[in-house]
Amino acid sequence: MDFTGHITHIGQLEQFDTARGTHVITRDIHLETDEQFPRSGCFTLRNDLAQNFALSIGETITVKFDITMRTNKEGTRAFNQLNIWRIN
């Protein structure tokens, strides 16, 4: 999927180890469209994309992303994550 919008927020780098022992680096960014009724989303950059992110608030970008879903341990609540895999 594609999403084009301007950057409204750039989060800090976050590092953690997964349950499988993999070290992961992430950074969240918020994008908003320039339409009459703007759409917005919180997108996650991982590893190299998160570390090498060199854009600024206000810049317009197009991202390609996947949607993943996870649940809490009880399986009663679902969370969606928008994972960027390319920035144009």
Segment roles from a protein language model:
Residues 1-88:
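Single-stranded nucleic acid-binding surfaces, predominantly the OB-fold ssDNA-binding core
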